[in-house]
Each structure stands twice: as structure tokens, then as C-alpha cells.
Amino acid sequence: MVRPDYEGLGTRGPHPYLRGESLARAMSDMALAVRRAFPEVGRHWVAAGHSEGGVAALNTGSRTGPAADVPGLLGVAAITPVTQVDALATLLGDAPVAAPPVNVVVSLAALILKGQATEDRALRRLLLKQGGLSPEAVALWPDLERLCLEDLGGTDSWGGLSPQQVKGPRGDEALEEMKNGLRADDIRHLRMRLDLPIRIDAGALDSVAPLPLTVQLAEEYRSRGYPVELAVWPAEHSPTADQAAPELAAWILDLFDDTTGGTR
């Protein structure tokens, strides 16, 4: 088991949150580095992750992405992968209050804006210098480099702002830029490697990756002929990973068994 050095997390610099190409590149770099340093582990591997890590795993399975040329990928497993955040932003974009689940969506949107702004200087200027964000939101921008999603949702951070309080004079313009970027980079649109086993674990109580959107993702993949196994757990976003872990581990080991003829 190896953890990738995601850009800006395992390495210095800003983290392009939910940016599929960066995430898949980190996964493929990890696999190649292990192969060079520890050739005895073999060439076969499985990409797995939770939340943003699930997005990374699915992007790793794309037949057109940075990891497409890395051989030996047996399957991908995504626990509560985030999809259709643009729909959540549209649904809650005018909410006047900061309360669950609005605080979660606000925090998630802030991380996404930060990720997009690391790759788009014009968007960064719009957000921080040209009225895309309110002064209160600009003051909280540094939190995006030091806090995780759960802490960002607190009342002393982005979770203390309603969607309306996040927006500056050009807030609607910034919101549309964010949604356009999300639509273009959504995991729904990935062209996956053919015949690559895909497992998706969803939380029935998930407020970050709502179950109906995750089910829709699985159905869209299946409609394109991708082999998808979907499991649903009675949990919120992060606890889903703990509940899914034993069954997911067995699924991964079965992939290796199929390759090695039953010897692990």
C-alpha cells in the first residue's frame, strides 16, 4: 500500500483540489516510483481513494489521462467520489443562511475555487482582487491551505458564511466560472479504460457526495459499458470509508487473485 504525493500536499506549493489531471499524474508517478524502487512487488496495482482520492482513482482509470500509459492497473476503487458539485452550487447558491448542509457545500466550493485558481491566474485575480469574493471570504482564503474540509465547515471558517455572504460584487460571475470548470472536469465525462473493473462505495447519508448523484454516476458508467460495482453504506461522507474498508479490501485482493492464479 502506497500513498501518492499529491501536488501541493505531498509536495510544496498550492494544491489543485479536484483537478483530475493533477490527481491522476500523482497516482501514476507513485506507481512508477514504486516499480523503480521496489521491483520485487511486481507490476500490478489498484488505484483506490476516498473523496478527492476517489476522484483521483477514477481519473487514473481514464484511457486518455496521464496514467493511461502506466501498465498493470487491475482496477479502480472510489469511495464517495465527488461529482456534480455544480448542481449543488446551483441548488444552494442563493441560500441566505450558514447551516448544515449548506456549510459543507460552501466549504467544498471554497476548496474547489482554490484548486481552480491555482491553475487559472485570471480567476484568482477575479476572486481576490476584483470582487469575486466578499471581504469576509477573502480574509478566510488562507484557511484553504491549512484546514481540511471538516474544519473548513466550522462556524469560525467558511462554514460560518452563507453562500450570499461568500459572494462579492462579481460573485455570480465567479460562481459561473467555477461551475464551468467543474462541468468540464467532472468524473462523469471520463473515458475509462475498457474492461477495467470499477468499484464505487457511497454513503446513504453523505452531504458532500450525495447518494443520488453517486448512483447517477454509476449508472452513466454502466450505460457506456464500464463494469461498475456499487455498494451503499449507512454513513456520512468520511465514515463511509471505514464501513466500506473490509469489503473493499476483499474486492482488491480478488483482483490480485485473478491475476496471480490465487496466490497472494
Where on the chain are the PLM-derived regions?
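Conserved alpha/beta-hydrolase
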Residues: 1-11
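Short alpha-helix in the alpha/beta-hydrolase fold that links the catalytic acid
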Residues: 60, 196-198, 210-220
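Accessory cap/linker subdomain of secreted extracellular hydrolases
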Residues: 82-189
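Primarily recognizes the serine-hydrolase "nucleophile elbow" in alpha/beta-hydrolase
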Residues: 32-38, 42-104
